[in-house]
Amino acid sequence: FAERHKKSIAIFSMEMNKESIADRMIASQFGISSYELKVKGVRDNYIEPFNETITKLSNLGIYCDDKGSLSTAQIKNSCRKLKTRLAIEGKELGLIVVDYLQLCESKGDTRQNEVAKIARDLKAIAQSLNVPVIALSQLSNEVEKRADKRPQLSDLKETGEISAAADIVKFIYRDEYYNQKTDKRRTRRYYLWVLH
């Protein structure tokens, strides 16, 4: 996104640290897993392309906050400051990523109400800053109990409010994860629901 659209990205990761995110980004550029990158390392003939990839990624304008559990007010405040700073530099904030929604701090009488408020607050951030927000979410364990493992809207963990607040809900499904003998290896299917 950052490279294609020439816009900056703010990532709020409450589960992974910056180093792990960077490892995954670098590994994806080489078509390997971050585990392979750590275990096998970089072969001699890949050192130069590896260093070029690191330089390229570091210049893309990807800002990562890995402080842990943040409130939506803290996310909004950070994004507002970043957007102002980028505007002074003649740059633009083009995307906000929250990984993941259920780890945001919130107060409510039930967990379902907390998550509903977080989803609404993230929607409000997108609207007030005029920047799309991608909020990652966990699925409930119920999907594992079904024969058909393809995700559905009802599988969003803890609340239907996530789908109510979202403009688009997209799921990733890999058939090979559940069916070892599949003829659809290394293909991902995206299930998309557009909500208004």
PLM ranges: what are they?
Residues 2-3, 127:
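Anion (oxyanion) recognition and catalysis
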Residues 4-92, 106:
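Cytosolic-facing regulatory segments adjacent to core modules
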Residues 4-9, 59, 93, 98-101, ...:
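Active-site lining segments that contact anionic ligands and/or coordinate catalytic metals
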Residues 10-13, 63-66, 97, 135, ...:
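Structured core elements
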Residues 14, 42, 101, 138-139, ...:
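Short, ordered loop/turn segments at secondary-structure junctions
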Residues 17-21, 42-50, 71-75, 97, ...:
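Helical mechanochemical/support elements of P-loop NTPase systems and associated helical scaffolds
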Residues 80-81, 89-135:
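Helical hairpin unit composed of two closely spaced alpha helices linked by a short loop
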Residues 114-196:
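Phosphate-binding/switch region of NTP-binding enzymes
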